[in-house]
Design a protein with these regions (language model features):
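Conserved alpha-helical scaffold segments that buttress catalytic/binding sites
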Residues: 1-278
Length: 278
């Protein structure tokens, strides 16, 4: 079992949902913080089946995680930068979890549930940051999770998005995304969705399904991102409190470009060696 003060173990996983099983196999005891370097937040609610987008909520439900620092790319979506405190718990629909955070990300998949509707409840403190020039301090026990799609992300639904752009135009999609991002109540969200469906039936669901982050970087830019991330982590967290480091390929799921994987892997592992043995 890894404990504060020891050299953290490094686990290399194919997909992000494997992290939960690896943490349990490592015998880590919660609660701890997960520092998630990722193109996606991975904070969707557990529906009864574990997947690459909802494993963190299940870790919260199990009492393993009580804090999340999401380090995101400027092209990422899901949440705006800032601090969020909310509850995650059972909704009464089987093993399904709900979130008390009133934001579009949770309205979209019907994951939102007010606190008084949750049968069980665990608190999560979420910090979202894009600009890594200023450290975000914490003395909590933590694990570091690095998804390689942070250094270059593909959209598996890119072809569908292209068709949608041809149909209604990129400007319309951008306007709808900007407007939707500002909504903070479920009633407003439902009205927003109904207005779009009246304008063009089925368009709302289609846009939401294919509107995913997509960005690419040159080798020099990837190295620059690693250097920037290295500085941020060194200033923000104590490596002696790190319980484990998890590297995620995300090639099979289609989010990390297989052509870029080798150089991303090389850059990240070179930094991780320096992080573990300063």
């Amino acid at each position: 079992v890894a404990t504060g003060g020891s050299i953290p173990k490094v686990s290399h996983l194919k997909e992000h949902d494997e992290l939960l099983w690896q943490v349990l196999d490592d015998g880590l005891q919660g609660p701890f913080e997960i520092v998630n370097v990722d193109a996606h937040s991975d904070l969707a609610m557990f529906t009864g089946q574990l997947d690459i987008g909802n494993f963190i909520s299940k870790m919260v439900d199990l009492g393993l995680v009580d804090r999340t620092l999401w380090v995101k790319d400027k092209g990422s979506m899901d949440f705006m930068d800032g601090f969020y405190n909310f509850a995650i718990g059972r909704t009464g629909e089987g093993l399904r979890l709900g979130s008390s955070l009133s934001v579009p990300f949770y309205f979209l998949n019907e994951d939102y549930a007010p606190r008084n509707a949750l049968i069980t409840s665990r608190e999560l403190a979420l910090t979202v940051v894009t600009d890594l020039s200023k450290p975000v301090f914490s003395d909590a026990k933590w694990i570091l999770s690095i998804d390689y799609d942070y250094f270059g992300c593909r959209n598996p639904q890119a072809k569908d998005l292209e068709e949608m752009i041809k149909m209604i135009g990129a400007e319309t999609i951008s306007t709808l995304y900007t407007k939707g991002s500002t909504i903070r109540t479920l009633v407003e969200w439902q009205e927003f969705r109904n207005d779009i469906d009246r304008m063009a039936p089925g368009v709302f669901t289609a846009i939401c399904r294919c509107l995913l982050p997509s960005f690419t970087y040159s080798t020099e830019e990837i190295m620059g991102k690693v250097v920037e991330l290295s500085s941020f982590i060194h200033k923000s967290r104590d490596i002696n409190n790190c319980l484990g480091i998890y590297l995620i390929d995300s090639v099979g799921s289609g989010f990390t470009d297989s052509a870029k994987h080798a150089e991303i892997d090389k850059c990240v592992k070179a930094w991780i060696d320096r992080l573990r043995y300063p």
